Regions:
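Conserved acidic carboxylate
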Residues: 8
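The feature encodes the CheY-like receiver
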Residues: 14, 56, 85, 103
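Short hydrophobic/Thr-rich beta-strand motif most characteristic of the beta2 strand and flanking loop
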Residues: 25-32, 40
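Acidic catalytic/metal-coordinating carboxylates
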Residues: 33-36, 59-63
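The short loop immediately C-terminal to the conserved phospho-acceptor aspartate in CheY-like receiver
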Residues: 49, 53-54, 83
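Charged docking surfaces used in two-component/phosphorelay signaling
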Residues: 15-23
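Short, Lys/Arg-enriched segments at the junction into DNA-binding effector domains
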Residues: 3, 116-133
């Protein structure tokens, strides 16, 4: 399954997500602020990033932008946040997110979205290999 970086400042929500994703076989690394998330991304690759937006130090939008500038699109990003207006969603997607999920959410919906973005990423890699290979 996937190696996931979860950056979520609310400890209860982070624990809920971590437990749920581990039940589905994913490996989850948790950071509680954007600065800690950015530091770990310098040293370790992940299959997927799940980012809250409202966080101390570096918010999720800025972390997504930094990640895209440094690493491009090597891993998909899902924004997971309480901010749910159309304007918020547009900001998240414009920052480089591949998907956007608002709180409250169900674990099955999150897992389904993870599968979907990983399928799209896998399909793109296959297409790139076919075209380039």
């Amino acid at each position: 399954m996937a190696k996931i970086l979860l950056v979520e400042d609310e400890i209860n929500i982070a624990s809920f997500i971590e437990r749920g994703l581990k039940e589905f076989g994913h490996t989850v690394t948790v950071c509680h602020d954007g600065n800690a998330g950015w530091k770990i991304l310098q040293d370790e690759p992940f299959d997927l990033l799940i980012l809250d937006i409202i966080m101390p130090k570096i918010n999720g939008l800025e972390l997504c932008r930094l990640y895209r500038q440094r690493f491009g699109y090597q891993s998909p990003v899902i924004m997971l946040t309480a901010l749910g207006t159309t304007e918020d969603i547009v900001k998240g997607l414009d920052a480089g997110a591949d998907d956007y999920l608002t709180k409250p959410f169900g674990m099955m919906e999150l897992v389904s979205r993870i599968r979907a973005v990983l399928r799209r990423t896998s399909k793109k890699e296959e297409d790139d290999t076919y075209v380039l290979g």
